[in-house]
C-alpha cells in the first residue's frame, strides 16, 4: 500500500502545488488590465503603471535565487509562506496607493512574493515528493497549472473590473493570495526518503553551468520568451482597449465579450491557452 502511494502521480503535494501556481500566476497575468483604470482614476500616463509592472518582473527575477537559497536553508514551506504573505501584502497596500512611486515600490514587494510562491520553491517540493518514474510528468503538470492561470485570471479580473473599482479587485486578489496559505501544509515530502546531497557550492555550480552550452541556450530561450510574454501581458489589453472601436451589441464579437476591456482580457487568456 505504501509503495503504491509513493508511486502515484496525482499526490496531494502535486495538487496543492499546482493550485498554488495556478492562483499565483492567474493574479500575476491580470496586472495589464489595471493600466487604464488606474491611469484614468489618477489622470496618469499609462507608462507610470507599466513601469511598476516592469519593476515587478525584475523583482521576480532577482528574488528567485534569493528565495531558492532561503528555501534551501529554512525549508520550502517557509519560503512559499513568506512569498504568499509578501504577494498578498503588496497587492493589498497597492489598493490604497495614490502615487506612481508607491505603486512602483509596492511592485517590488509583489515581485518578491511571486518569486517566493512561484515555480522555484513549488517545483522543488513537487519534484522531491514524486517518484523517479513520475517526476518529469509531475513537474510538467505543475508547470502547466501555472500557465493555466493566464487562461483563468484575465477573464475573471475583467468581470470584477466591470462591477467594481480596481482597488476593490486588488483587495479581493490579496484575500485570495493569503487564503492560498492553507495549501502550504500539504507540501511535505517523505522524511524517510533517501536524498543524496551534493557537496558542490553555489560558485562551483554557476561556473559549471556557464561553461555548459546547453545551459546558455536554455538561459537565452527563457530570457527571450519571458521578455515577450511579460511585454504582451502588460501592454496588450490596454492596446486593444485604446485601439478598438466600441463593441456593437448583436455583433459576432459581442457573443464572447461586451466591452473592449473584456476583449483585451480574452486575448491574454487565448495567448495563455496556446
Question: What are the residue ranges of the model-derived segments?
Answer:
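Juxtamembrane cytosolic amphipathic helices that cap and anchor the N-termini
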Residues: 7-16, 207-221
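Residue-level signature of mid-helix packing/kink "hotspots" within the transmembrane helices
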Residues: 29, 57-65, 150-151, 258-266
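Extracytoplasmic gate region of multi-pass secondary transporters
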Residues: 31-35, 213-262
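Flexible cytoplasmic inter-helical loops of multi-pass small-molecule transporters
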Residues: 188-204
